[in-house]
Amino acid sequence: MKISCEIIGKVDSGDVSKISMENNNGVVISTLTTGATLQEFLVPMETGALKNIVLGFSDFEDYYKNNLCACQSIGRVAGRIGKASYTHNMVLYSLPKNEGDNCLHGGPKGMQVQNWNYVTNLNDDYVETKFIRRLYSSVDGFPGDVTVSISYRLNNNNRLTILFEAFDVTESTVFNPTNHVYFNLSDKQDLSSHELQIYSDYRLELDSELIPTGQKINVDETNYDFRKTTDLLPRIEANNGFDDAFVVGGGTCDHVKEVAILHDKESGDGIEIFSNRNGLVIFTMDDIEDNIYFARDKGKMAKRREAIAMEAQTLPDAVNHKGFGDIILDKGHSVNYEIGFQYFNSSR
């Protein structure tokens, strides 16, 4: 295994670096300090060439020219917080609004717009890039200052693990991060050869602003039933796209479990998704701006429904709904979350 680092630009807070990790099987994970971003998940093809199975940009500045949050670290709280507020211990907390009256993905100064410090680690078991940053209430508008670390670990079993830790918090706050990863496992600009399985019996009911109502709906005999491996594109078309949250892991947040499998039937490439939380949000890029060019598309403009975002997290708006999971982080406490992406190829 090996690791390399290079400075690729500058922002007001300092240098922007790209860190690339490679295992003994030729799988390469590249990350950026801006947004603690997963830029590349490169897997070897039979030809020997590498294929990027996630959406990313060649220029780090392009991540901030659209609202996709492509493969960036999202927080303090992923997803929407209804009315940009919550109550804890009889105290009403107001958060920054950046989508109507709601707070989306940590607000306008969330983790994805920060430039992170990092350290690297190479040992017999894995290669690791660990990002760390102090988040200040005066900057992001969330209560309390807190230190956050985000570790990307790649092992020789072709598993990428993302570890989130929050600690040294000055007052009670909320923490529910994710990586807004977008997958396309093929070499095409669509999902026509993809199939999906989600271990979920229920999805969340959403209102017109995509805020959970508090109700969980059984997926049985609906377009949301992915309990068996299902061709993805026909479901996307029948449902007019997805921007939905599924209840996974038995609705608990106690240990790491497999929650979904995405597979490309043509190449055989697949990803098993693991999480120690109770929610999986899928988003199929149904509305996309013009003039977006992902590196993997080699000069072609991005297309609607080109990829699927699969965001493992505690259920959205959990702080406002009993039974959705506890995302409160009190002073003197710390919390750890884990997301795993196990790459495989079914034809080799």
From Swiss-Prot:
What does UniProt give as GO cellular component?
cytoplasm
User: Which catalysed reactions does the entry list for this protein?
Assistant: alpha-D-glucose = beta-D-glucose
Task: Look up the EC number in the record and give it.
Answer: 5.1.3.3
Pfam families in the cross-refs:
Aldose_epim (PF01263)
Question: What enzyme category does the UniProt record give?
Answer: isomerase
UniProt xrefs under CDD domains: galactose_mutarotase_like
Q: Where is the active site?
A: 180, 311
Q: Name one GO molecular function term.
A: aldose 1-epimerase activity
Pathway assignment? Carbohydrate metabolism; hexose metabolism
Q: Which UniProt keywords apply?
A: Carbohydrate metabolism, Isomerase
Residues binding substrate: 80, 243
**Does the keyword RNA-binding belong to this entry?**
no
GO BP field: galactose catabolic process via UDP-galactose, Leloir pathway; glucose metabolic process
Query: Isomerase: present as a keyword of the record?
Result: yes
Q: Which NCBIfam families match?
A: galM_Leloir
Q: Which family does it belong to?
A: Belongs to the aldose epimerase family.
**Function noted in UniProt:** Mutarotase converts alpha-aldose to the beta-anomer. It is active on D-glucose, L-arabinose, D-xylose, D-galactose, maltose and lactose.
Designated name of the protein: Aldose 1-epimerase
